[in-house]
Amino acid sequence: SLVSICICMISGFVSVIFTDMTLLLLVTIIFNVTLFASALTFANAIYAFGGFDNREILRLIKGEKKARYNFTVIHIKISFLFLFIGIVMAILFSLVGQYFAFYDLVIHSIAIGFIGLTIALYLPLMLPPIIGKIIHFTSLNKIPLLLIIISLIIRAVGDFILVQPLSSSSLGYIQISSPQILTYFFGSSGWLVVAAMLSFVIM
């Protein structure tokens, strides 16, 4: 993981120094691939997607502790999944073509899917000393998480079907009946994120 992070940093600095487009493309690909490798190795190091037998833990803990454990596991898995999707979109942006769909999904998958869900994961742990109130994990539900996932799915559908070609750059753009459709489509995605935040605060 540390080796991958070092390669990421070096390739990032090189991309700033050199201006040759071929070299920049190569460095960008190296950066994205090593970034993916570092994220993957880190996820593996914390057993984000398995590799650790937690059956004994689940058997011993109950109530609030079990709810907190399940809340943590679910949010870690889904947040890292969005991080991987974002990095893959960045790699496709470099290799396939600089389409808006890839660029848009990189930003939203990482900023909302990964960072947003990571913040949601730690907020119940950080807020009690600030607000002077204990947050009970048993009272938390999956509505904010589901709203975030639906929001990003809507975003992806809008990017790939309403805005961008389905595969290669030779296919051109898919026409939509009205630009307002696109506005409403992406707007609904944004409002779902707001709804997710509000529902999280209400919980």
For each predicted feature, which ranges?
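Hydrophobic alpha-helical transmembrane segments of multi-pass integral membrane proteins
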Residues: 1-203
